Amino acid sequence: MTSTLPFVSVIIPVYNEAENIQKCLNAVTSQTYPKSKYEVLVVDNGSQDGTKEIARQFSTAYDNLEILIEDEQQGSYAARNTGIEQSSGAILAFLDGDCSPHQQWLERGVSTISGTGVDLVGGNVEFTYPNGGTAAERYDSFTNMQMKESISKRNVAKTVNLFVRQDVVEDVGPFPNHLISGGDVHWTKRATDAGYSLTFAHDVIGCHPARPFGELLKKQFRVGKGQIQVWMLDRISLRRVFALALWILVGFLPKPPHYLSQDLRRTGQTVTKAMFVRILVVAWCCRLAENAGRLSYILRSEEQ
């Protein structure tokens, strides 16, 4: 049976992930999928916190794990592209360095993509609460990386936990190297627009730590900058400029409470009234940070 299994390349871009990479690689190297049938490509993007050294310990212990370097361009998409260039698998499994997959992650991901004939599989992201479930962690857990929602409503996915056939990557092309954020959504949209099929697999699970408040604000600022980058990829028209201006104006307003209530119900979470108020404040701060990212990129572009 092993001889008929497809070879898989697990691609993990990392940048200053010393806090999480050991847990991630422990999980990736302990899969039920035969070790002779997969390789792990850790692509370091200029880490300065010991991430590379931790990964090297694993490459010494495991023949199927290799460290690659992408130091010409900063960005996770550039790192993923480097991994793609060096990969040998018929299936590519993208994973973030702070995401720790369940032991049957590879086996179930390959089974889904091979058994159903689909081209892309987005896995489930389960959140953990390193700080006990603060308002910021709660908000992150029901708003970010909602793979089922992204796939069912928008037909796009994130690379935090994504399986793709290698021939799809060959046809669609590489990730946009220059994007700060949103490159995975942009890329998967290109793939599905080209006719490739994408499905969600609830049992292909990766565990991700929910972000604390400061990290969440940094992420949303980066997301805002990436949104403008993606917006600028399409032809600019007066109608689109007007829509962008309205988008930015609305971005200064608090998120309506009923939307947050819907998100909580969708993910099966219940919180106290006091926690809900704190989540509302976090949501507004994140919205402002995202808007600041948009304006920052627009103003920077005007200066160049």
Swiss-Prot record:
Where it sits in the cell: the answer is: Cell membrane
GO BP terms in the entry:
S-layer organization
Disruption outcome: Mutants contain only mono-, di- and trisaccharide-modified phosphodolichols. Deletion does not alter cell growth or stability of the S-layer. Mutants exhibit defective or limited motility.
Pathway it belongs to?
Cell surface structure biogenesis; S-layer biogenesis
| EC primary class | transferase
Instruction: Output a single Gene Ontology CC term carried by this record.
Output: plasma membrane
Enumerate the UniProt keywords alphabetically.
Answer: Cell membrane, Glycosyltransferase, Membrane, Transferase
Q: Which domain of life is it from?
A: Archaea
EC number, as in UniProt: 2.4.1.-
Matches recorded under InterPro entries: Glyco_trans_2-like, Nucleotide-diphossugar_trans
Which range is the signal sequence, renumbered to this chain? none
Family annotation (SUPFAM superfamilies): Nucleotide-diphospho-sugar transferases
Q: Which GO terms describe its molecular function?
A: glycosyltransferase activity
Q: Which residues lie in coiled coils?
A: none
Q: What does this protein do?
A: Involved in the assembly of a N-linked pentasaccharide that decorates the S-layer glycoprotein and flagellins. Catalyzes the addition to the dolichol phosphate carrier of the hexuronic acid found at position 4 of the pentasaccharide.
Q: Which family does it belong to?
A: Belongs to the glycosyltransferase 2 family.
Listed name of the protein: Glycosyltransferase AglE
Organism encoding this protein: Haloferax volcanii (strain ATCC 29605 / DSM 3757 / JCM 8879 / NBRC 14742 / NCIMB 2012 / VKM B-1768 / DS2)
